[in-house]
Each structure stands twice: as C-alpha cells, then as structure tokens.
Amino acid sequence: MYFSYLCTRKNQINIMTMIPLENYPYTDAQIQERIAEYTRKGNPYMDEQQACRFILNCIDLTTLEGSDNRAVVEALCQKAIDFKDDARNIKSTAAVCVYPPFAAIAKEKLKGTSIHVACVAGAFPAGQSPIEVKLAEVRYALEQGADEIDMVISRGKFLEGNYQEVFDEIKAIREACANAHLKVILETGELKTADNIYKASQIAIAAGADFIKTSTGKIAVNATPESFLVMLDAIKAHYEKTGKMVSMKPAGGISDPETALKFVSILANVLGEKWMDNTHFRIGASRLANKVFDKIQ
C-alpha cells in the first residue's frame, strides 16, 4: 500500500539529500549540567505568577481515554472556558485535545471563544497503520472541525533507519492539514537516545511540522527535561540556519506547577522570549491546569 501511495505523489523529496541529519552535539553529562544551570537561573522574562498565567494559557487540556463520550468532552470544554478570569488577568487554555469523533462536539461547545480544537489523528498512539489510513483519519478530524492535528511518527520505521518513509508520512499529513497546525509527536521515550531524538526532530521539522511534541502520554516514559532540551536544541539550530520558528509541546507526566515551571525555565534559557506565547509553546496535560490555576494569586 505504501508503494502505491508513493506512486501517486509528485516531486518526491529525498530527506538525506535535502538535509544532512546531524548528530547531537552534547553528551548526556552536558545535558544534565545544562538542565541544572537553566533550573538554577530560572525564567529571566517572568516571575512565578506571570509564568503560572503563561502556563495555563499554553495548556492543551486533554482527554484521550477509551471511556470518553459527549458528556466528558463537553465538561472538558466547559472547564477550559471557565478558567478565563478577566478580573485576575487569567486567560483560558490554548486548546482542548480530543479524539476525532469528538471534534464537532468540542467545536460547537467552544464556539465564540479563542480556544482551539486539537485532535490526535493518524493512528495515535502507536502509529502502526498504513499511510492511507492515517490520512483518512486526519481528513476526517479536519472535516469535523479540528483546528490542529497531533500526529505521531512511525517509531519502528525510524528505529530501523527508514528515515525517508518517516519523512514522507509527515510530509503527506502536513499537506493534508492545509491551514491547520500540525504537531508531530516523536514519542521520545521509545527513541531512547539523545541522538535519535535530535535526528527525529530534524526530520519532523524538515517535513513541515508547526510543532514538535515529546510524547503521547500513553507509555511509561513521557516528557522529560532531557528530551525537551534536545528538541529545543533542534529548534534553535533550525532557527539559526533558516530564521523559521518551530513551536514546541512537551506532553505527558507534567502534572504539577513545579515541573511545568522547570520546563518553562529551560524553554526561556534556550530559545528566549520570542517563544514565550501559546503560538510557539504548548503543554499537553489533563491534571496540571487546576493546580496551576489554584497557584495563581
């Protein structure tokens, strides 16, 4: 099926000739040293209260469970809406993230707000379906009202060195998304090494990702400061070469304000103030929002 799909595409791009995939320039020890340094420095652009407001406004409030239904999704959307408090200068979350069958429900519930509808699509979370099936699900989500698509790369193909097919799949989904934002999940817990994470980030960026995202939240190892830093370094290297800002989304396991503040401090120290808005930074979370909201004075 993949061969038949490729035969229908024009102007095939060879990822290996388009960009030379670079090895990650830091050792594991240097990664730890940098994380400690950035954590110690903190956020140079915001105090803690400002950072908590920023974090809340960057959350993709998420429900991705087999038990999801209309009532669950409508309640999630109402929760996202209710965080907004003009008197306390608190904005709503950036988006809600749901499975494609609930996109239309979320779209209707969020009508008249600034909150986007994000959908996981493309054989989330395993990515183990033919590209034709992935594209069909992405198109369905968009037809149902999704503003943003969160796809996951084919880790098995990446780990066997089939970088071209990984690139082609992301590129095809990018084209299907048209004006919708595409977040590309690397599932860093399965990629294992910093070098793999860095190369996968380069492939996703080259294929047109608007965001690169750490994790599905469906395996044991989700967003870590280490994987987050490696991905930020890939974004920074791309920006220094091209001037293009690629956005970042850690997701999975960020369930308390202290952890979220640490991630934001790393973001601020690596990429700077230009990335400090919800166009360029998101956090995927379900439990974090209430705790951050309660911390805001």
Describe the residue ranges of each PLM region:
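Helix N-cap/beta->alpha junction signal
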Residues: 99-100, 224, 256, 285
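C-terminal alpha-helical cap/extension of soluble enzyme domains
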Residues: 17-59, 87, 243-297
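Residue-level preference for alpha-helix termini and adjacent loops
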Residues: 58-63, 120-125, 157, 190, ...
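Alpha/beta enzyme core
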Residues: 49-50, 69-91, 103-108, 112-115, ...
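N-terminal capping/small domains of soluble enzymes
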Residues: 16-122
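Short, positively charged and aromatic/hydrophobic N-terminal segments
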Residues: 2-5, 9, 14-15
